Structure formats: structure tokens, C-alpha cells
């Protein structure tokens, strides 16, 4: 996994996409890749991706997410970043964290991308104002594709500013397809 304290492992999947000098010239942006502490999560939940009754904390952010929120506001202040242009993206456990953060702190984010993640459907309605682009591989054996399908279905009923892309014949590594997307 990408957890730990080396400040490198979180760059394994997608890091080079954003770090390439040629890519950065196309975007006037700051990009951060926070690393989740070892043996912890981006959201406060006990996860069993194969059942629908994951146990979630309905209100509190995880310690990791609280630190991330503090970092975001610190960077906004220090670098004069437009607070209306803050976007979040996560894959796998980070996809869960993306949904959790947009559900509990929708005031922060202008948009979100969740790749092969899942959501707490009982509070996801709070994230409806944040446009989401949700990606998943149809053959994912780590996080069932149904998790993303359900999230998209719920969000779409509440607001039309959401996109869903499902990759045929693709397993958990759907981020490889995402980073190859022309529109991405």
C-alpha cells in the first residue's frame, strides 16, 4: 500500500502524472499528495467491501483527514490559493476518503474524483453540491464496483453534475485507465 511515513509511497499510483514537468506547464495549480499514516484510514469506518453494511462514523473526520483539512487551509493562506478551486482525488482507500471528506466538508471542495472507492451512502447526500467524477473497473476484486455504482446513482438523483466511468475488463487498477483518459 501507499500508507506510511516515507512521503514517497503515496506517489506510486498517479504521482508521475502530476509531477511531470510537461504536465505541470498545462496547469496553473498546486498539487499535494498527502500520505495516510500506517495502519490508519482516510475515513472513520470499519470496512468490509463485500458487504453493504460498512460501519461508519457519521460526523467525525479521521485524524488523517483532519490533518489534511488543516493542511489545505494552511496552503490556501500561505500561497494565496483560491479557496473556490480546491479539488480532491483519491483511489481505493483514498476514494473512500474522498467521498467521506466531500460528505463531511462539502464547503471546501469545488470538485472530486473517486477512483475505485466507496461511500457512506447514509450521508453522501451532503456531498451532492460537489461535482464528482467516479471511476471504477467492472472486475474489481478489492472494492466491488457496486460501491461506485451506488454512490453515482444516489448523487445523480440529487444533482446532475456528476460523471461515472466504468472500465470493462478492468480490475482494481482502474487508475491506469483514468490517467490515460484524454478528458482527464
Report residues per predicted region.
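Short, proline-enriched alpha-helix->beta-strand connector loops that line the catalytic pocket
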Residues: 27-29, 127-132
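Soluble non-cytosolic domains of exported or imported proteins
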Residues: 58-66, 103, 142-146, 175-178
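Gly/Ser-rich "nucleophile elbow"/oxyanion-hole loop immediately N-terminal to the catalytic nucleophile
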Residues: 45-92
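Primarily recognizes the serine-hydrolase "nucleophile elbow" in alpha/beta-hydrolase
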Residues: 73-80, 84-126
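Short, solvent-exposed loop/turn and secondary-structure capping segments
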Residues: 5-10, 42-47, 100-101, 124-127, ...
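Cell-envelope and extracellular/periplasmic
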Residues: 1-5, 76-79, 91, 98-103, ...
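Active-site machinery of serine-nucleophile hydrolases
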Residues: 2-65
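C-terminal catalytic histidine-bearing segment of alpha/beta-hydrolase fold enzymes
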Residues: 115, 122-123, 131-135, 139-184
Amino acid at each position: 500500500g501507499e500508507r506510511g511515513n516515507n512521503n514517497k509511497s503515496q506517489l506510486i499510483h498517479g504521482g508521475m502524472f502530476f509531477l511531470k514537468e510537461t504536465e505541470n506547464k498545462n496547469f496553473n495549480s498546486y498539487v499535494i499528495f498527502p500520505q495516510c499514516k500506517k495502519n490508519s484510514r482516510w475515513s472513520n469506518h470499519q470496512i468490509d467491501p463485500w458487504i453493504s453494511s460498512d460501519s461508519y462514523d457519521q460526523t467525525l473526520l479521521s485524524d488523517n483527514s483532519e490533518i489534511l483539512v488543516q493542511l489545505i487551509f494552511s496552503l490556501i493562506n500561505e500561497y494565496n490559493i483560491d479557496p473556490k478551486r480546491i479539488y480532491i482525488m483519491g483511489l481505493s482507500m483514498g476514494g473512500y476518503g474522498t467521498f467521506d471528506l466531500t460528505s463531511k466538508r462539502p464547503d471546501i471542495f469545488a470538485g472530486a474524483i473517486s477512483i475505485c472507492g466507496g461511500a457512506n451512502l447514509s450521508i453522501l447526500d451532503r456531498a451532492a453540491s460537489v461535482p464528482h467524477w467516479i471511476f471504477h473497473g467492472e472486475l474489481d476484486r478489492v472494492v466491488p464496483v457496486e460501491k461506485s455504482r451506488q454512490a453515482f446513482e444516489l448523487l445523480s438523483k440529487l444533482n446532475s453534475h456528476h460523471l461515472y466511468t466504468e472500465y470493462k475488463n478492468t480490475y482494481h487498477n482502474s487508475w491506469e485507465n483514468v490517467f490515460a483518459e484524454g478528458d482527464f
